[in-house]
Amino acid sequence: MDEGGGIGSSLLSRITTTASEIMMRNEPTTTENPAVQEMNHIYHLTPSMKMLCILFYSILCVCCVYGNVLVILVIVYFKRLRTATNILILNLAVADLLISVFCIPFSYWQVLIYDDQRWLFGSMMCSLLAFLQAMAVFLSAWTLVVISFDRWMAIMFLLTPNIRITRRRALYLVAATWIFSILMALPLLFTTRFFEDQDGLPNCGENWTYFGDSGEQVRKVYSSMVLILQYVVPQAVLIITYTHIGIKMWNSRVPGMQNGATKKMIVDRHESVKKLVPMVILISALFALCWLPLLILINVIPEFYPDINSWGYILYLWWFAHGLAMSHSMVNPIIYFIRNARFREGFCFFSSKLLPCISFKELRLLTDNTSRSFRNRSRFSGVINPTSSDEKPATSLTRYSRSGVLDRQTCRSARFFEARPLVVVRNNSANSLA
C-alpha cells in the first residue's frame, strides 16, 4: 500500500505515479503521443467534474466536522450523558473528526487543484498525514468493535451489573483502542517519504527500501495485515456479536421476580437496550458498506488485475469509492440525531448557540412548552446507555421544580439555558420530575 495506509490514498498514489511516468508533462509530445493522450483522458478530470468534486468534498468536510464536534460537545458538556456507551461514542466521534480533518481535505487537494498532482505540504506533513489517516480509520473500526461488546455484555448479563462495562472500564478500552491504532499505523510514519519525481515535482509516497531486497514482501505483509485488522476482523466480530444479540433479545423474557420495582427496572433496561441496539447495528452496517468498495479497489483488485491503472475512467471509479468511504464520518451524527431524542435535543441546543440565526422547530417546542414536555416526557425519553452499573439515578439535564419553574440554585448550567432552558427528561419513575 502507498500513502494513506489503507484509508484511500494508496490507489491514488499508484495512479498518479504511473501517470507521471507516462504523461511527460510540459513536453510537446503530450498532444502527439496516443498513449499520453489516453492517459490524459484517464487521469484528468474535466473542469466541470473538478468543480463538482470540490463542491462535494467541501460540503462533506464541513458537515463531518460540524456534526462530530456537536456529538463531542453534547457528551462532554452534559454530565448525565457521560455514560459508558456514550464515552465509546465520543471516541468514535473523535475518530471521525480526525478522518474529517486529515483524510478528506488532503486526499483530494493535489489532484483536484493541480493537474501535475504535486505535493504541497512538505516532508513532515507527508509522513505525519499518512500515519494520522491510518490511525484514525483503525480507531473508528475498533471503537465500533468495543461498542458491540458493550451492547453484547448489556444483553447477555442484564442481571449481573458487575460484569457490565462501567465508565472506568470504558476509558480503559478507549485507551487500548488508541494504543492499538497507533501501533498499527506506526510503520507508515517511517516508510512514507517526501521525494521529487522525474520531472522535479514534489511528491509523497511509501518507500520500503529500508528493508532491502525484502522490502516489497514486507509491504505486502503489512498491506494484508491492514486489510484484515482494519476491516475483515472488525466486521466478523460485529456480525457475530450482533447476531448473538438479536437471537438473545427476541427469544428471551425477563425472569419473574417478587420485587415489582426491581422487575420494572429490569424490563425498562431491557426495552431501552432493544431501542439502542438497532442504532449501533445501523452504524456498523454503514461502516461496512461505505468502506468496502474502496478497500476492494485498493487491496483486492490490483492483485488480480495489475493493469488496473490503465482502466478507462479509473480516476472516476476511485473518487466514487473514496467519497463513499469518507461520507461514513458524516452519517454517524445524522443517525444519532434521527434515532436518539437526547442527542437531537443536544444538537438543537448547541446549534442555537453556534448558529443563532437558525431556528429549530424542536428546540422551540422544548423551550416554549415546558409543561407539555413534562406531560409527554415519554416522547423524549431516549436513553443512550441505561445499563451502565455506575450510572447514578437520572435527572433532567436541567433541574426544574415540580411546578415547572427553573430552579437556578440547583442547576449547574443555568447560565447556559438562561430564562428558557432546554429540557431533557429521563423517564425513570413516575415521580422523577427533577
Curated annotation (Swiss-Prot):
It is a multi-pass membrane protein. Residues 1-55, 108-128, 191-226, 299-310 are extracellular. One of its GO terms (molecular function) is neuropeptide receptor activity. It is found in: Cell membrane. GO terms for biological process: determination of adult lifespan; negative regulation of feeding behavior; negative regulation of locomotion; neuropeptide signaling pathway; positive regulation of egg-laying behavior. Glycans are attached at N207. Gene3D superfamilies: Rhodopsin 7-helix transmembrane proteins. Expressed in many cells, mainly in the head region, with expression detected in the head muscles, I2 neurons, MC neurons, RIH neuron, AIA neurons, AUA neurons, ASK neurons, ASI neurons, a few B-type motorneurons in the posterior ventral nerve cord, pharyngeal muscles, body wall muscles, the intestine and a few classes of unidentified cells anterior to the nerve ring. Expression in the MC neurons is important to mediate suppression of feeding while expression in the RIH neuron is important for the facilitation of egg-laying. No expression detected in other tissues including hypodermis. The chain crosses the membrane at residues 56-76, 87-107, 129-149, 170-190, 227-247, 278-298, 311-331. The keyword rRNA-binding does not apply. Disruption phenotype: Eggs are retained in the body as normal during starvation but the number of eggs laid during the initial refeeding period is reduced and satiety-induced suppression of pharyngeal pumping is slower than wild-type. Suppression of serotonin-induced body fat loss. Its main location: membrane. Residues 77-86, 150-169, 248-277, 332-434 are cytoplasmic. Disulfide bonds join C126-C204. PROSITE patterns: G_PROTEIN_RECEP_F1_1 (PS00237), G_PROTEIN_RECEP_F1_2 (PS50262). Keywords: Cell membrane, Disulfide bond, G-protein coupled receptor, Glycoprotein, Membrane, Receptor, Transducer, Transmembrane, Transmembrane helix. CDD domains: 7tmA_PR4-like. One of its GO terms (cellular component) is plasma membrane. PANTHER family: G-PROTEIN COUPLED RECEPTOR, NEUROPEPTIDE RECEPTOR 22. Belongs to the G-protein coupled receptor 1 family. Receptor for the LURY-1-1 and LURY-1-2 peptides which control food-related processes including feeding, lifespan, egg-laying and roaming behavior. Receptor for flp-7 which stimulates serotonin-induced fat loss. Serotonin induces secretion of flp-7 from neurons and binding to npr-22 which leads to induction of the atgp-1 lipase and subsequent fat loss. Acts in vitro as a receptor for the flp-7 FMRFamide-like neuropeptides TPMQRSSMVRF-amide, SPMQRSSMVRF-amide, SPMERSAMVRF-amide and SPMDRSKMVRF-amide. This is Neuropeptide receptor 22. The lineage of its organism: Eukaryota, Metazoa, Ecdysozoa, Nematoda, Chromadorea.
